[in-house]
């Protein structure tokens, strides 16, 4: 089977997080089953931010047993990346099904248009709460306008979908308010155990000479880093903390400056170790 997977970002932009890894893992597993898989995405590059686009990245690249096709982003508003070239890439290719991940995106809108035009099945999935994500709450006027504009686009994508895959019952309930129940299937996220194997000595590589708590993820306000720092501040003088540190590892999605200020204000410089841009 020929399968097109659509996502706002792909390798090497690992800082984008969950939906990128879901798309790459899915492509890897499907290609191992002898399907022909292509990921259609943007030219977002690896960086300590979510907005570094690189025209020098290959337009087409084979990774493992699947292909990545990139097109340049001409406009980005928050995490809404506009890359019109993807439409023409997808129109020129042939596939039996499209699976788009992260439906509050320009890429998913293009995927829905292509699926309708070519009359092929569209499968969609989302992560993080389509209508309940903290990013949708208490934001500035520009962000609120953007989300309002997205609503008919999101509904069009949902209406076009043959199947909706959710990772849990919580997300299923969200989608059930927007479409019929028989479209929705719960497929829980899996773990590729081969990817969990490592020969790298983490403590040696990053010169950590003590026990540690590890936060690994994006520096974003929705990740709860402020709560974590408040908690560490409460216990920093406990005897056990004399040999234990908090290691924060990731990339900046808008919260790094505030995070560093909190660490300084709480006098946690000797308790917290920051590792930016992990490989």
Explain the meaning of each model-derived region.
Residues 113-117, 130, 144-164, 178:
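Membrane-proximal helix-turn-helix segments that form the acceptor-binding/catalytic region
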Residues 257-278:
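Nucleotide-activated donor-binding/catalytic signature segment of Leloir-type glycosyltransferases, i.e.
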Residues 43, 170, 190:
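Carbohydrate-associated surface elements
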Residues 9-13, 216-220, 225, 235, ...:
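Short donor-sugar binding/catalytic loops of nucleotide-sugar-dependent glycosyltransferases
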